């Protein structure tokens, strides 16, 4: 018999097989990299009995009503019962589809199955390759409120040096993509997170419809081959991955202090999910037992002293504490206010201290060491309150004991609690202690189409100088020191939307901003 001819593999098929092999190599190497970034955790301590969850009435989601349709316009006979029933069934099916679209997805999700569709995100798991080796009223676009003249006129040498360094951060412009800056998610950016690795900037973005984008900003543009010498070769888009991990807005990211592979995300779909970068799987870390219970989660944080505990706030004015080693039904949930909590944070060095910001126009400090009351009245001890003229959007603790808030009275307020480590459990703070040390005029009127401006501290600054970032309605990102002095106003050519969601890398002087188009601005 004549020898069989080997099948000819097309260039496309060869490239596809190479991509599959590369993805497998990338994912298999992430665990090794994670061990280099963060050592293996100590053996788990004996499980302690968790406190019973306070009983409360769950909020039920309203069933979507079918859209009314005209029988006459649909050409149905008024007496045709069969056709009427058919129309009713079709309406019910559409209503069920609308309801299912906003229901959270339970169970484990493989990233390969929830990839966001679209040319910009067709790289899929390739985007995880970056983890290998781990004051006018209203906006005035382009008008600076902090200029080079402010830097030059600084008389204090230390402050001037810091201002020069922060103002010297350059806008990331490696990729000449349309619109100048990479698009991480399809819809408006609502949350950002920097992976804590210092080897390269890796940014996570969450949008208003539940998509999570991942981008490794260290990748270099690769010029595509071009056979025509008369025309310039096209530069391919950067590798960006986006996955539909939630069904509603992703409000917050948090990175495990002991596992470099673990990324936690929270959403208005009432769930907290853990993304395992090694396995490429998103698992449910917390969700109400009743799938119809609506518990929109506005923020999450984790105490540095206990990586198995996660704290979360909700739009229903509650604060929750959940041990990740136990079932969601064992979580403690406390009612703190009748109005929504827009943001909260834990003191990085004293994680039993919680600062909450609420629609009830208050900043409140709570102590998790002392839980008091019974039944629905059970809650952490309230240490102090400060009232603002309008609602407070976010409260952010620094590692040195400052709290920065943004509010709709167009103020950034900085509170100073240097002796927080000496507070006894449940000890009340005086009115004088709760007064802000500094108030900074700042336009916080975002309107409907811009994500709410929230201050975010650099968690562990290398230089030991506490500083935070916040979006600016004039299409900049502002950088402030703990004493309220402005250090920089970051901008650049081609920024056509407000980088409302601003984030500092935990240790490096890298600043990210996300806008309403799903695009990223990055200063390094």
Swiss-Prot record:
Belongs to the WD repeat DDB2/WDR76 family. The keyword Transcription does not apply. It comes from Chaetomium globosum (strain ATCC 6205 / CBS 148.51 / DSM 1962 / NBRC 6347 / NRRL 1970) (Soil fungus). PROSITE patterns: WD_REPEATS_1, WD_REPEATS_2, WD_REPEATS_REGION. Disulfide bonds: none annotated. WD repeats lie at residues 184-225, 245-285, 295-332, 336-376, 385-425, 447-490, 493-524. DNA-binding protein that binds to both single- and double-stranded DNA. Binds preferentially to UV-damaged DNA. May be involved in DNA-metabolic processes. Pfam families: WD40. GO terms for cellular component: nucleus. Residues 54-65 have a biased composition (Basic and acidic residues). PANTHER family: WD REPEAT-CONTAINING PROTEIN 76 (PTHR14773:SF0). GO terms for biological process: DNA damage response; regulation of DNA damage checkpoint. This is DNA damage-binding protein CMR1. GO terms for molecular function: DNA binding. Residues 35-79 are annotated as: Disordered. Keywords: DNA damage, DNA-binding, Repeat, WD repeat. The keyword DNA damage applies. InterPro entries: WD40/YVTN_repeat-like_dom_sf, WD40_repeat_dom_sf, WD40_rpt, WD_repeat_DNA-damage-binding.
């Amino acid at each position: 018999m004549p020898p069989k001819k080997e099948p000819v593999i097309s260039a496309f098929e060869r490239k596809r097989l190479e991509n599959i092999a590369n993805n497998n190599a990338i994912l298999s190497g992430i665990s090794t990299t994670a061990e280099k970034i963060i050592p293996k955790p100590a053996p788990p301590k004996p499980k302690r009995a968790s406190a019973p969850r306070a009983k409360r009435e769950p909020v039920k989601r309203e069933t979507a009503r079918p859209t009314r349709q005209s029988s006459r316009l649909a050409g149905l006979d008024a007496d045709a019962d069969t056709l009427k029933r058919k129309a009713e069934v079709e309406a019910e099916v559409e209503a069920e589809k609308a309801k299912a679209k906003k229901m959270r997805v339970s169970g484990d999700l493989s990233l390969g199955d929830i990839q966001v569709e679209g040319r910009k995100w067709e790289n899929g798991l390739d985007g995880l390759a970056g983890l290998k080796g781990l004051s006018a009223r209203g906006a005035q676009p382009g008008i600076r409120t902090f200029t080079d003249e402010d830097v030059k006129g600084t008389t204090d040498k230390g402050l001037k040096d810091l201002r020069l360094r922060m103002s010297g951060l350059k806008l990331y412009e490696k990729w000449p993509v349309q619109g100048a800056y990479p698009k991480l998610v399809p819809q408006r950016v609502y949350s950002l997170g920097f992976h804590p690795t210092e080897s390269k900037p890796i940014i996570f973005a969450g949008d208003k419809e539940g998509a999570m984008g991942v981008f490794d900003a260290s990748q270099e543009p690769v010029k595509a081959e071009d056979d025509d010498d008369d025309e310039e070769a096209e530069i391919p888009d950067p590798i960006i991955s986006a996955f539909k991990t939630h069904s509603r807005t992703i409000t917050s990211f948090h990175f495990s202090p002991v596992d470099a592979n673990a990324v936690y995300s929270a959403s208005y779909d009432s769930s907290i999910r853990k993304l395992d970068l090694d396995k490429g799987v998103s698992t449910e870390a917390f969700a109400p037992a009743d799938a119809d219970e609506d518990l929109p989660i506005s923020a999450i944080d984790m105490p540095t002293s206990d990586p198995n505990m996660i704290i979360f706030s909700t739009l229903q004015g509650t604060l929750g504490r959940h041990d990740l080693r136990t079932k969601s039904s064992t979580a403690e949930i406390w009612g703190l206010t009748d109005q929504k909590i827009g943001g909260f944070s834990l003191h990085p060095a004293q994680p039993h201290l919680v600062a909450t910001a609420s629609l009830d126009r208050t900043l409140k400090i709570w102590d998790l060491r002392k839980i008091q009351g019974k039944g629905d009245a059970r809650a952490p001890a309230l240490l102090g309150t400060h009232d603002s003229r309008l609602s407070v959007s976010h409260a952010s603790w620094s590692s040195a004991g400052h709290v920065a808030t943004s509010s709709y009275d167009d103020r950034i307020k900085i509170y100073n609690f240097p002796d927080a480590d000496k507070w006894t459990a449940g000890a009340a703070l005086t009115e004088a202690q709760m007064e802000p040390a500094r108030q900074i005029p700042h336009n916080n009127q975002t309107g409907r189409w811009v994500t709410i401006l929230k201050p975010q501290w650099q968690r562990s600054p290398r230089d030991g100088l506490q500083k935070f970032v916040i979006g600016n309605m004039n299409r900049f990102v502002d950088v402030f020191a703990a004493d309220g002095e402005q250090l920089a106003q970051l901008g650049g050519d081609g920024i056509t939307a407000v980088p409302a969601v601003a984030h500092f890398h935990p240790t490096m002087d890298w600043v990210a901003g996300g806008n309403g188009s799903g695009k990223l601005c990055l200063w390094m």
